């Protein structure tokens, strides 16, 4: 096999991998959902998260998630304006592959339009492709709307975390099993 053929094959494999990770944008009504594309989007997503979430995150936290698991970040745009984002990761936890949703935000003016649930569903689909056994997230214990959203998507409350957030608020941890590894046989 010549070097030219080897290079072409390697290039095709790499291009296919990129296409698999970064699927084409999906549009529902006026809302366009796109995978994270790179560093040029960090400032906008940081601004949205800082505006909507009470918990402060450093640039290092964003880069930790986005550089290692870019395929687990999705953004929602309306007419070119970033209005929603979800940032997640995958890790091994007690012999299971765990998907972890670290941050999810929808601009207040765009809530109650199923944008958050669409971002979560996109992420869960990707986590299933990545062979995750479960999905876990935390939210402020008093955030009834968010808890209701997660429970409507199949998540179950599993733990209360006292004084979990830096501002002293309690959190609730929720879990969504993705396969039957949780069943006692």
Curated annotation (Swiss-Prot):
This entry's Gene Ontology molecular function terms read:
protein-N-terminal amino-acid acetyltransferase activity
Could you tell me which residue ranges the N-acetyltransferase domain spans? 31-179
| Native source species | Dictyostelium discoideum (Social amoeba)
Which keywords fit this entry according to its UniProt record?
Acyltransferase, Transferase
Which Pfam families does this entry report, sorted A to Z? Answer: Acetyltransf_1
Q: Its biological function?
A: Probable catalytic component of a complex displaying alpha (N-terminal) acetyltransferase activity.
**Any coiled-coil regions, as ranges:** none
This chain's protein is named N-alpha-acetyltransferase 30
The catalytic activity of this protein is classed by the Enzyme Commission as 2.3.1.-
